């Protein structure tokens, strides 16, 4: 249910080519990183992969994979999930791993939700030192 946030790292300098879409448009905003600590997004994102996400102004305006924090039993918990905004303002929260249930957050259930950014890439980390 939870994903590890080895804290959200500060913005990183990156080669422009790394985050350019198929139309040649660079991802706007600052790029930040964290490490995936759970299996809820398998097979799309593997545990321990480095996730790069772009500042989205704290809002989910279109479907995608987002990094967000919510209070769980009074403590902040970081989630990396597929989020689909609905016309009524609710958010459908989806794990790609079918062992996890999809759930909906109504507008009144989103007050403790802080959206950190939209995931733009994940990368396998192999350390050599």
Over which residues does each language-model region extend?
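Acidic/glycine-rich C-terminal interaction modules and beta/coil loop segments
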Residues: 4-13, 17, 24-129
């Amino acid at each position: 249910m939870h994903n590890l946030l080895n804290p959200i790292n500060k913005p990183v300098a990156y080669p422009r080519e790394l985050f350019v879409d198929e139309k040649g448009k660079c991802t706007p905003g600052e790029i930040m990183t964290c490490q995936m600590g759970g299996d809820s997004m398998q097979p799309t994102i593997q545990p321990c992969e480095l996730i790069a996400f772009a500042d989205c102004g704290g809002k989910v305006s279109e479907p995608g994979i987002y990094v967000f924090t919510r209070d769980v039993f009074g403590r902040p918990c970081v989630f990396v999930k597929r989020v689909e905004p609905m016309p009524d303002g609710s958010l459908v929260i989806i794990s790609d791993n079918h062992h996890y249930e999809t759930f909906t957050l109504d507008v009144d259930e989103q007050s403790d939700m802080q959206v950190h950014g939209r995931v733009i890439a994940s990368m396998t980390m192999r350390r050599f030192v």
